[in-house]
Amino acid sequence: MMARIFILALLGQLCFLPYLDAITSSPKVQVYSRHPVDSNKENFVNCFVSGFHPPQITIELSKDGEKIPKVEESDLSFSNDWTFNRLVSAPFDPNSRSEYTCKVTHLTLQEPKVVKWDPENN
C-alpha cells in the first residue's frame, strides 16, 4: 500500500515538472509607438511586458521622469507557457523632445527595469 502511495506521489510530481519553469520568470519589456513617428495620427507610447510569473507586477509610464497619471492598461493575459503579458499605453507627441520611459517592478527583479523609448529603433 505504501509503495502505491509513493508511486502515485512521484507520478504527480513528474506531471508537474513542465510547469516549474513558470513558477518565477522575469519580465521582458518593449517600448514603442503605436504609429510611425512621422505619421500625423494621434499617437500612443506602448509598454509591452511579457513572459513574467507570478502575475503581480507594477508598470509605470513616465514623461521626462514624471509618472504619467492616466494610462490605459490591458487585461492581464497569459501565454501557452503560463507566463503573463500586459500592455500599458498613453497618448503622446512623438515629435516633442520629451523622454518616455517604462518602469517595471516585479519580484524576480532585484531593482526595477527601466526601458527608454527610442524613436530611432521604433
Curated annotation (Swiss-Prot):
Keyword Glycoprotein (UniProt): no
Residue span(s) of domain Ig-like C1-type: 27-115
Keyword tags: Disulfide bond, Immunity, Immunoglobulin domain, MHC I, Secreted, Signal
GO cellular component: extracellular region; MHC class I protein complex
Superkingdom in the source lineage: Eukaryota
GO biological process: antigen processing and presentation of peptide antigen via MHC class I
Listed InterPro entries: Ig-like_dom, Ig-like_dom_sf, Ig-like_fold, Ig/MHC_CS, Ig_C1-set, MHC/Immunoglobulin
Intrachain disulfide bonds: 47-102
Region forming the signal peptide: 1-22
Compartments reported by the entry: Secreted
Principal place of residence: secreted
Xref: Gene3D superfamilies: Immunoglobulins
Subunit structure: Heterodimer of an alpha chain and a beta chain. Beta-2-microglobulin is the beta-chain of major histocompatibility complex class I molecules.
Family in the record: Belongs to the beta-2-microglobulin family.
Entry function: Component of the class I major histocompatibility complex (MHC). Involved in the presentation of peptide antigens to the immune system.
Name of the protein in question: Beta-2-microglobulin
Originating organism: Trichosurus vulpecula
